Regions:
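Short, ordered beta-strand-loop transition motifs
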Residues: 1-7, 66-68
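A short core secondary-structure module
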Residues: 4-5, 9-56
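Alpha-helical interface subdomain recognition
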Residues: 5-6, 73-75, 89-94, 98-215
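Glycine-rich phosphate/pyrophosphate-binding beta-alpha loops
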Residues: 13-19, 65-66, 103-107
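Short, solvent-exposed loop/turn segments at the edges of secondary structure
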Residues: 20-21, 41, 69-71, 101, ...
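Short, charged, solvent-exposed linker or helix-capping segments at domain edges/interfaces
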Residues: 36-38, 57-59, 83-90
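Flexible, small-/acidic-enriched active-site or ligand-binding loops
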Residues: 53-80
Length: 215
């Protein structure tokens, strides 16, 4: 720290929507302390204004999927952050990030459920319209049984998500709850997207259908 300002230097990639934002919460090492497990860095949280001197929002990468938002690179070139912008006491950043992490994981889970529902809808519509051997392909058990499994998995994931969201409202959610929901929903999406692609076939890899964005 110098003259009442913290001097931040470093770089962070894959920052969602930074190009359309004015602020971010930054977690940075502000010192070290001796613990029973050895030297540990003190992590503190700051509210950063992207117009602060030394803060640069650079162009990031083009996503294979998730094209509805940008990801950017944040560069801190000796950025000067006023001391009053520290969120909580020095060294409180790790506690804060753990406090926020659970609800944030649920937003990821909710996105996965929504994308899985979209993939299922595309596959179901295709199976209801595409004809082979004189009937809709959805009439074949090799297609209809996987569709039933997909619907069941999505239902299970959504119920897990709703339960944890309810627990947040009640103040009883745990880190384990949120971690399990995110794990199940994200892996569920992978399975649903793959099965939807199998249902649609080669057309699923074409941009004319949005499945390739999900897969």
């Amino acid at each position: 720290m110098k003259d009442g300002e913290w001097i931040i230097t470093g770089e962070k990639h894959f920052i969602s929507q930074a190009s359309v934002s004015d602020y971010c919460v930054l977690f940075a090492a502000t010192g070290e302390e001796e613990t029973s497990k050895g030297i540990k860095k003190r992590i503190s949280a700051f509210l950063v204004d992207f117009s602060d001197p030394g803060v640069e929002v650079a162009e990031g990468y083009r996503n294979v999927s998730h094209r509805g938002y940008t990801n950017n690179i944040l560069r801190f070139n000796g950025a000067r952050i006023p001391e009053w912008r520290m969120m909580g006491p020095e060294g409180d950043g790790f506690r804060l990030v753990n406090e926020w992490l659970g609800p944030t994981r649920l937003t990821v889970a909710a996105t996965c459920v929504a994308r899985a529902e979209r993939a299922f809808d595309i596959a179901l519509k295709y199976a209801s319209e595409r004809e082979q051997f004189g009937q809709k392909i959805g009439k074949f058990q090799g297609v209809s049984f996987p569709l039933a499994d997909m619907a069941t998995e999505i239902k299970m994931a959504n119920l897990m998500l709703l339960e944890s969201a309810w627990k947040i409202d009640q103040g009883s959610v745990t880190a384990e709850d949120c971690a399990m929901v995110k794990l199940y929903c994200s892996e569920m999406l992978s399975r649903i997207a793959d099965q939807a692609l199998q249902t649609v076939g080669g057309m699923g890899l074409m941009e004319e259908l949005p499945l390739e964005r999900i897969w």
